[in-house]
Amino acid sequence: KNLNFTDTSAADGTRNGLPSYVTNGQQTFFRYGSAVIADGKRVRIAPQAYYYNGPFGLITEYARVSQDVSKSADGSPAAGGTAVNESIVAGTNKKLKHDAWQIAASYLITGEEASFKGVKPKNDFDLDKGGWGAWELVARYSEINLDKDSFKRANGQYGTDAGASLTAANAGTFAYADLTKSAKSAKTWTAGVNWYLNANAKIALNYEYTTFDGGAITKGSPIATNVNTTGSNVRDRDDEQALLARFQVAF
């Protein structure tokens, strides 16, 4: 019977490139626009709680990333801009806050004690001795919600990526997210099974189903000024289904 709460946080000042977000199937579903750069602090918090009782386990986690960004007429280094960004467009600095959370449950059908530190099978996998290790069923729900201001222009209106390059004159026409690739949110349902061969080796097999809100443009249509809002020509990305297998060895 274990109940524990942990909290980790980190903060750093940066003016480099910005990360993209990908699914477990390695598909990018959110990235910043080519003219957007990190300009200030990035703060991450990730509190976590877990509970174990006999073969049953439950873990939940929340994460928030707060990122200061601006727009540069030189573009982003990661998107082919100059190595040092000097032409920051006035009035485009914004703090974006992205949130994610998950809850996962597990049950050891072979009767072992569940633990945050790992599972020790009653009988290690050994065909000669008739041992089959430990078997665990798992289920998880997770979602991420991107800051709605990511999809707005500097003046607060939903905008387009009009124009070949960003300048002080046309800065208001650029959103902070790459509107051709970025979804407003993603939700994933996962079901799987873990096979613990022994205390140090595990084989995991998971099926994941992910849905998206936004993130795809209707074929043949330009980006609308009311992008990612009701009535726009931006549709949801296709659902993603993934079957993932992993072999893990711990020492």
Where are these regions (language model features)?
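Outer-membrane beta-barrel pore domains
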Residues: 4-251
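Internal, glycine-rich beta/alpha segment that forms the wall or movable "lid"
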Residues: 1
